[in-house]
Amino acid sequence: MNKLICGLSSLGISLSSVQLEQFETYYRELVDYNSRVNLTAITGYEDIQLKHFLDSASLALAGIKGDEKLLDVGSGAGFPGLPLKIIFPGMKLGLLEATQKKARFLSEITAKLGLTGVEIISQRAEDAAQNPLYRQKYTLVTSRAVADMATLAELTLPFCAVGGRVVAPKKGDIEEEMDRAASAIKKMGGRVSEIIKVDLPGLQDGRKLVVLEKISNTLSQYPRRAGMPAKNPLI
């Protein structure tokens, strides 16, 4: 895990032997499970360290606290939520993943890593966000899903408590995308707080973190029914 260790040192993060072993286990189980269920196209040892583990950890640049209540929307193989949970074991983590096969992997890997305080939520984001158990209950919401920022705003901000934040990893030139998302962000009760450049060893390819602050309650009609935020973004 030398690539990961080097990158984390740039973030001021050092791992215990237990945490290092958790990352090794995560790597082995991910590659093994991926041979049966399509979780990721990235399977090389160094690539996973950089493009999955360190990329997930880069959210620490947004000032993550160890006692956050974090929701990872569209978690897939667990990124960025599970690496953040390994690094910050005191946080409470929700992994939202609608695909049953992926949700099953999340349940199994969480158990094998010995993590506690993790909830697997196997629902569509549009449905879960209308559930009082999850709506506006998180201090931090993230999603590494490949979606336009206008769509992501509608799928993430309703989960975020007022005063909390959404941190969305992005890549490349996002100026036009952010302009298109302005209306959706406002309608969800959010505002753009900052955009952080990610410049870490092995991750010097234009990655950014878009940080949204939740400043008011999301109106009850949002998010719209399943599929609408992606099909017809609020722009």
From Swiss-Prot:
GO cellular component term, pick one: cytosol
Alphabetized Pfam families for the sequence: GidB
Positions bound to S-adenosyl-L-methionine: 74, 79, 97-99, 125-126, 144
Enzyme Commission code: 2.1.1.-
Gene3D superfamilies named in the record: Vaccinia Virus protein VP39
One function term, GO molecular function aspect: rRNA (guanine-N7-)-methyltransferase activity
InterPro entries: rRNA_ssu_MeTfrase_G (IPR003682), SAM-dependent_MTases_sf (IPR029063)
Highest taxon above the source species: Bacteria
Subcellular location: Cytoplasm
UniProt keyword list: Cytoplasm, Methyltransferase, rRNA processing, S-adenosyl-L-methionine, Transferase
General function of this protein: Specifically methylates the N7 position of a guanine in 16S rRNA.
Family: Belongs to the methyltransferase superfamily. RNA methyltransferase RsmG family.
Alphabetized NCBIfam families for the sequence: rsmG_gidB
HAMAP family membership: 16SrRNA_methyltr_G (MF_00074)
UniProt protein name: Ribosomal RNA small subunit methyltransferase G
Organism: Dehalococcoides mccartyi (strain ATCC BAA-2266 / KCTC 15142 / 195)
